[in-house]
Amino acid sequence: MIKLKVKKGDEVIVITGKHKGKKGKILKVFPEDSKVIVAGVNLVKKHTKPNQMSEGGIRTKELPIHISNIAHIDPKTGRPTKVVFKFLEDGSKVRVAKKSGEIIGKEGK
């Protein structure tokens, strides 16, 4: 299992595949599979039969995407960027956009 640099709520862009260029927020992270679910990306329609618990019908849901197919969006430029970890003067570890040096995530807001 590799160290993931993505967290729930991060803004990402799809860089390869049939959804290339789409942007969205990460809804869920699966570290054991190295996959994430991105809002509005990789949508599929699921046909369900009615049962006692729920109605039947066609439901749309997002499927996971491998983390190698996404990149963080630089908060300063709005373009795809790589992420590095840096330590601040107070000793806290933060994620930083490699191109602009901006802090990514909740730490930067």
Curated annotation (Swiss-Prot):
One Gene Ontology CC term in the entry: ribosome
Any Pfam family matching the protein: ribosomal_L24
InterPro entries named among the record's database cross-references: KOW, Rib_uL2_dom2, Ribosomal_uL24, Ribosomal_uL24_CS, Ribosomal_uL24_KOW, Translation_prot_SH3-like_sf
Any one GO biological process: translation
Keyword Nucleus: no
Molecular-function GO term, any one: structural constituent of ribosome
Keywords from the named record: Ribonucleoprotein, Ribosomal protein, RNA-binding, rRNA-binding
UniProt key word Ribonucleoprotein: yes
PANTHER family reported for this sequence: MITOCHONDRIAL RIBOSOMAL PROTEIN L24
Subunit structure of this chain's protein: Part of the 50S ribosomal subunit.
Protein name as annotated: Large ribosomal subunit protein uL24
Species per Swiss-Prot/TrEMBL record: Rickettsia canadensis (strain McKiel)
Gene field: rplX
